[in-house]
């Protein structure tokens, strides 16, 4: 950070601002990142690799899938939209900033490749309840959290929202004009292609081992897959193990999307998001979702998943409608603490817990990172709106560039917050 003060100006200026850098600079912050391996080629890994390549860093990617954009990132079409909250909490801020970052990045990729990665349908975020809608109306009247440009979002009543979406909706909500649908898997592959990042697929990394020079990636037979001074873990639910961070706080959230016929909900013009969501994909099929099949429950039967999704569909519409289930899509998300991803240097949790044991009243220990080991994981259900922004932040931290985020957001995303939460639970 900088210490800013006013001083006497020069020329025709009465005053000028004078800044002195007060942030401590050490060998680690001045260390130049030159050679990086990214583990994982989903939305997180592909975006991190792209940003590193743009920064001039030599980077390559390893993943267990044959091609980038597999696993939970393999959606043919996913919804890209911000979320509104009247208090503009951290989740809403990251969602908005990430939405804009992803839209901008997709525009660049489409211009360079001629591919169609985005369908500009708009998106309607319907209020979950009448009370929430009233709260939104009150907030809009008071310009909370700030005045939103009409070109970005409009708050519509139920009738107007229904006309915009093409269906009779149960209540009103925010219409985000620049939202739409993204070819998620193709987005990942295009990032890698445009950045010319080498990809080693069909390769499972089971361990990341510290060496004097950096880190070794090992496979199931103990073989060395690769080595680099810096490694970024973007391996979804495998990230905690690979980052030596058992308290990273990622939770596996299996989920299923119900697919309907192309003739169902024929009037639907854009995605509608509320307790659940409905959308029409470019191939015509309608999708309804999605389930959150918590690990604490028994594995769900397919019929139970469809029933849950159709219940979500009913919560969005005024009148029930006849639809026919044709199939499903399923995947396992990795959700971070507080529904926020883990982005930053991997924490040396053993050293952190030792320091906390010596000073039980302290929860803010600096210098507890694992040098050269980084994490970007836990995007949850918001991979499209979180990934580009998270990658920007991480690569700025890695390259010691000016970090495009304030301190509160960096702390909220820090991988250290998992072990901090664990230590606090021990005190209860």
Regions found by a protein language model. Name each.
Residues 323-428:
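C-terminal catalytic lobe of FAD-dependent flavoproteins
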Residues 37, 44-55, 64, 72-73, ...:
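Active-site substrate-recognition segment that forms the wall
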Residues 93-98, 130-132, 174-190, 300-305, ...:
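Short beta-strand to alpha-helix junction loop
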């Amino acid at each position: 950070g900088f210490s800013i003060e006013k001083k006497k100006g020069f020329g025709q200026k009465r005053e000028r601002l004078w800044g002195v850098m007060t942030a401590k600079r050490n060998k680690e912050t001045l260390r130049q990142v030159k050679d990086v391996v990214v583990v994982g080629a989903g939305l997180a890994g592909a975006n991190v690799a792209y940003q590193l390549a743009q920064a001039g860093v030599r980077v390559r990617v390893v993943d267990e899938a044959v091609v980038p954009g597999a696993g939970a990132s393999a959606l043919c079409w996913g919804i890209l939209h911000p979320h509104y909250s009247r208090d503009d909490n951290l989740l809403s801020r990251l969602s908005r900033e990430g939405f804009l970052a992803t839209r901008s990045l997709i525009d660049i990729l489409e211009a360079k490749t001629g591919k169609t990665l985005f369908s500009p349908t708009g998106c309607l975020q319907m209020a979950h309840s009448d009370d929430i809608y009233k709260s939104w109306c009150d907030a809009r009247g008071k310009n909370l959290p700030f005045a939103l440009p009409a070109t970005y979002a409009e708050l519509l009543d139920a009738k107007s929202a229904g006309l915009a979406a093409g269906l009779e909706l149960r209540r009103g909500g925010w219409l985000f004009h620049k939202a739409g649908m993204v070819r998620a898997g193709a987005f990942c592959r295009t990032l890698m292609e445009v950045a010319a990042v080498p990809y080693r697929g069909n390769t499972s990394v089971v361990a990341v081992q510290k060496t004097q020079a950096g880190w070794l990636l090992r496979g199931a037979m103990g073989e060395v897959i690769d080595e680099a001074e810096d490694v970024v873990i973007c391996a979804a639910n495998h990230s905690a193990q690979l980052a030596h961070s058992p308290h990273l706080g990622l939770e596996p959230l299996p989920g299923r999307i119900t697919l309907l016929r192309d003739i169902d909900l024929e009037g639907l013009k854009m995605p509608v998001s509320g307790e659940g969501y409905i959308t029409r994909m470019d191939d015509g099929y309608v999708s309804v979702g999605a389930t959150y099949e918590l690990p604490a429950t028994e594995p769900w039967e397919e019929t139970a998943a469809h029933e849950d999704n159709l219940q979500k569909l009913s919560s969005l519409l005024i009148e029930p409608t006849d639809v026919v289930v044709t199939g499903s899509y399923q995947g396992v998300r990795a959700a971070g603490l507080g529904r926020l991803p883990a982005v930053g240097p991997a924490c040396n949790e053993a050293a952190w817990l030792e320091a906390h044991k010596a000073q039980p009243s302290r929860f803010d220990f600096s210098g507890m990172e694992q040098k050269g080991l980084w994490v970007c994981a836990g995007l949850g259900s918001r991979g499209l709106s979180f990934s580009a922004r998270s990658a920007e932040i991480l690569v700025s931290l890695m390259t010691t560039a000016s970090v495009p985020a304030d301190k509160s957001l960096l702390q909220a995303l820090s991988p250290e917050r998992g072990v901090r939460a664990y230590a606090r639970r021990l005190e209860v």
